[in-house]
Amino acid sequence: MSSIDKKELAKFEKISHNWWNKDGEFGLLHRINPIRLEYIIEKITAHYNRHLSKLEILDVGCGGGLIAMPLAAQGFNVTAIDALQSNIETASTYAKENNVKINYLQSTIEELESDKLYDVVICIEVIEHVGNVQQFILNLVKHIKPNGMAIISTINRTKKAYALGIIVAEYILGWVPKNTHDYTKFLKPSEIYEMLTDTDIEIKELKGLVYDPAKNEWKLSDDIDVNYFMCLGSKNAKSINVIPALAGMTS
């Protein structure tokens, strides 16, 4: 069974040529990308504490390569997959134009070579757009090496997330196109926790991403009511920051 949601794919296929237009439909992602990358690199460095160029990263649902490109430029060995061929074409063209080496593949997580494991699996702003979420997440964590890690981000299913993530972001401020998000697809951290119960993977850290209107900037926060990052790792490995993770299980 595939985790693809054809309606979601159709939405992104229409704008797949525009990933690198900072003033286009993906403008918000460009604005939050620096803080996203800062968090990702910080967590990978803390987890491995060794030279980054030797690490293999899988970027699932890579889109136009907004995360894959700068990670590869940092020295990571990046494989990036996306279900949309048009996304892969846009990403590959941009990487070639900028002389950045990335292994781009048009593939779903289910179609990916099953025995290929990675030091880090990344899935940023994707799971709120897939069909069978539990299947998707279980397939995702299967590709983590022993003692490896995963970093995912998504949107919490709260009234605050509906107000800010849909009403304000889509209909008032126009930060993203209308109908980009479906509130019913938002996920509480506790739901992901339950999905991982029968695996050897657990949540190691939760961290929120919030907008500060006074400073007109995005920043990391312990507020996970809307956007949040989640670090995953082996249940036998030391937690990165277990207190926020445990606190988040009530959300």
From Swiss-Prot:
The keyword Nuclease does not apply. GO terms for biological process: methylation. S-adenosyl-L-methionine binds at R36, G61, D82, I124. It catalyses: a 3-demethylubiquinol + S-adenosyl-L-methionine = a ubiquinol + S-adenosyl-L-homocysteine + H(+); a 3-(all-trans-polyprenyl)benzene-1,2-diol + S-adenosyl-L-methionine = a 2-methoxy-6-(all-trans-polyprenyl)phenol + S-adenosyl-L-homocysteine + H(+). O-methyltransferase that catalyzes the 2 O-methylation steps in the ubiquinone biosynthetic pathway. Pathway: Cofactor biosynthesis; ubiquinone biosynthesis. This is Ubiquinone biosynthesis O-methyltransferase. It comes from the Bacteria.
